[in-house]
């Protein structure tokens, strides 16, 4: 994408020029299917999987509150062992439902939902979706959330994070 070429990759503090040290590529946006969360999640997971299988390590920036789950779902099947997730955001995104939606502000609840000791909420199961269960190699202990806080946090999500012993760091802890 042309906008990526506008920015300089040199760090004055570190004395490092990222484009000289690393092979970087902006893969662009992944197209979504408005109004269809399942097809959108499939599209996102396939794109991330393709990037990962090409030998690149995806660093994913942007999107909405739901995309954490399909991003990790695209990588998790290709990882031997557990996946580590670093989530940088002000929102904890750990509750099971929000505004009657299962993926708005909820991706990390569902990503880490398939592990021993995790109490699964199935009260919404009058329908079934492929993301009703977590990813088996994404344990809660491997999720680190940085920058969490402010007045737009979530009491239910914070409670789930404490129950699952998620490392949720606010700006004072970083």
Language-model segment annotations:
Residues 1-174:
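Conserved alpha-helical scaffold segments that buttress catalytic/binding sites
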């Amino acid at each position: 994408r042309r906008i990526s070429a506008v920015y300089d990759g040199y760090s004055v503090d570190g004395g490092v020029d990222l484009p000289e040290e690393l092979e970087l590529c902006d893969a662009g946006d992944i197209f979504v299917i408005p109004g269809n969360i399942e097809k959108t999640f499939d599209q996102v997971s396939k794109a991330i999987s393709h990037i990962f299988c090409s030998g690149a390590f995806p660093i994913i920036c942007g999107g909405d509150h739901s995309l954490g789950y399909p991003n990790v779902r695209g990588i998790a099947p290709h990882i031997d062992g557990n996946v580590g997730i670093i989530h940088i955001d002000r929102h904890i995104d750990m509750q099971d439902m929000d505004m009657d939606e299962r993926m708005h502000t909820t991706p990390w609840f569902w990503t880490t939902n398939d592990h021993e000791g995790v109490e699964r909420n199935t009260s919404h199961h009058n329908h079934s979706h492929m993301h009703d269960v977590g990813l088996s190699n994404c344990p809660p202990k491997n999720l680190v959330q940085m920058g969490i806080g402010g007045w737009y946090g979530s009491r239910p999500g914070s409670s789930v994070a404490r129950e699952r012993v998620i490392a949720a760091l606010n700006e004072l802890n970083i």
